Design a protein with these regions (language model features):
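Bacterial N-terminal signal peptides that target proteins for export
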Residues: 2-10
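Bacterial N-terminal signal peptides
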Residues: 11-20
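Extracellular carbohydrate-recognition regions
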Residues: 25-51, 238-250
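Carbohydrate-binding surfaces in secreted/extracellular proteins
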Residues: 33, 106, 176-205, 228
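Extracellular glycan-recognition surfaces and repeat-rich motifs
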Residues: 40-80
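Secretory/extracellular carbohydrate-interaction modules
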Residues: 80-158
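Short, aromatic/His-centered strand-loop micro-motif at the edge of beta-sheets
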Residues: 159-182
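Flexible glycan-contacting loops in extracellular carbohydrate-active proteins
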Residues: 204-229
């Protein structure tokens, strides 16, 4: 009887360990925008009218473009703030899942020199982080005193001026217009890192906002986005999962 019980527990422990290890590895989410159905998990959100100079609205759609067949395209010139002192406009938010720690990669094609970037920990227009870049020497009178060109990491704190808190900025950095670009963005332990195809990097850190949605933000920019790959890197330690479940099994068989 003891031999049987020992074999049973050993077998169960092995199965639990394999199951927990496999479940801790996350499958990558791949979004290629092949057809209109591929945007069913996306929500398109414009800033409140009080924060817009060009009210748009935004025109997000699936359209054939310069990247890889069809892509997600935004063709309007929607921008804010109303006095044009802060880069604002429109969001494309992936609403199928929230993320805490993750890696996202995407191909990008910018039609002009205006603002574009990634948003994360998104809960609303007034609560999220963003990394944003612009080639133009704009805003002319920036609310945070930093004119373009730049890359910035910022935290949205309200729907009123100054809108964002600055986390970090890299001045004088531009991107290629009318050319394929690639972004890789990572969030881990409250630290953020964007790496571009030209090896330009910006890093920052903040832990106030944790979990939320991921998306794209544009300011007066017409652009294509495609071949998005998201990997959820937040996982329960499999050793803790096995330990908890193992304790419950022993309790049930005593």
């Amino acid at each position: 009887m003891r031999t049987y019980k020992a074999k049973y527990f050993l077998s169960m422990f092995f199965c639990l360990f394999i199951s927990a290890t496999l479940s801790s590895a996350q499958e990558k989410i791949k979004i290629n925008f092949d057809n209109k159905a591929s945007i069913k998990d996306w929500e398109f959100i414009d800033e409140a009218p009080k924060n817009l100079g060009d009210a748009g609205p935004s025109t997000w759609e699936i359209k054939k473009g310069p990247l890889d067949g069809n892509s997600l395209f935004q063709g309007s010139n929607i921008w804010g703030s109303k006095a044009d002192t802060c880069l604002m406009g429109t969001f494309a938010i992936y609403k199928a899942e929230k993320f805490k720690e993750f890696t996202i990669e995407m191909d990008v094609f910018a039609a002009d020199n205006d603002g574009m970037g990634i948003t994360w920990a998104y809960e609303s227009t007034k609560k999220h982080y963003r990394v944003i870049m612009i080639n133009d020497g704009w805003p002319e009178v920036p609310v945070d005193k930093i004119k373009g060109p730049f890359m910035k990491i910022q935290k949205r704190v309200s729907d009123d001026k100054p809108w964002y808190e600055l986390i970090t900025a890299e001045k004088g950095i531009t991107y290629k217009e009318q050319a394929p670009l690639h972004w890789k963005f990572e969030v881990k332990g409250g630290e953020f890192k964007l790496t571009r195809e030209d090896n330009k990097i910006i890093k920052g850190a903040d832990k106030e906002y944790e979990e939320g949605y991921i998306g794209i933000q544009l300011y007066a920019q017409q652009g294509h986005f495609d071949n998005i790959v998201i990997e959820n890197t937040w996982a329960v330690d499999p050793r803790k999962k096995v330990s908890t479940t193992w304790a419950q099994i022993k309790k049930d068989h005593n």
